[in-house]
Design a protein with these regions (language model features):
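Feature captures hydrophobic
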Residues: 1-165
Length: 165
């Protein structure tokens, strides 16, 4: 199990994306001739509700380092059906991306569990998108697969971890 929005989680997610043949096919051409990289902006992480010492040491370090004022940022580098990189960052100005998808932590949990479709969630304003929505719509199947792939990552959510004694 890996803790959501940590280095371990993003690395596992990257591996799972690259192992998915259906994603590779549906995302062919994504990011070719344009920047297809994303920042996932996870807002309102309830850090005050996370039990003390609940995280494994590396996840606790990541949460302390990468969650700033209740917000975390994850970079997903996507090109032509592959995920070439995935990692958390402190400041979104550190990288140039073509797209930023923003939303509250509770909505990200639903998306990471494949309880909502990303396109429907964007259209329903559960998330905001900075970037060319027409390009995202053209690759709607790939976007939906990214959500279902995230659900296959064995994930622990920071606010659902029991306190360790």
């Amino acid at each position: 199990m890996v803790v959501f929005a940590t280095k371990g989680w993003t690395e596992e997610y990257r591996k799972m994306i690259n192992q998915n043949k259906e994603y590779k096919e549906s995302a062919k051409g994504w990011g070719v001739g344009f920047n297809g990289d994303f920042i996932f902006q996870i807002e309102k992480i309830p850090v005050d509700k996370i039990p003390p010492k609940a995280h494994p040491a590396d996840a606790a370090k990541d949460m302390k380092e990468f969650v700033v004022n209740g917000t975390a940022y994850m970079v997903l580098q996507l090109k032509d059906g592959e995920c070439t990189g995935a990692y958390p960052i402190k400041d979104p100005k550190q990288v140039k991306v073509g797209f930023v998808m923003k939303g509250p932590y509770e909505n990200w949990k639903k998306l990471a569990r494949a309880q909502v479709d990303p396109i429907k969630a964007l259209l329903g304003r559960q998330f905001a998108l900075e970037g060319d929505m027409a390009k995202v719509m053209k690759y709607a199947k790939a976007a939906s697969l990214l959500a279902s792939i995230s659900a296959s990552v064995k994930t622990e959510f920071p606010d659902e971890l029991p306190a360790k004694k």
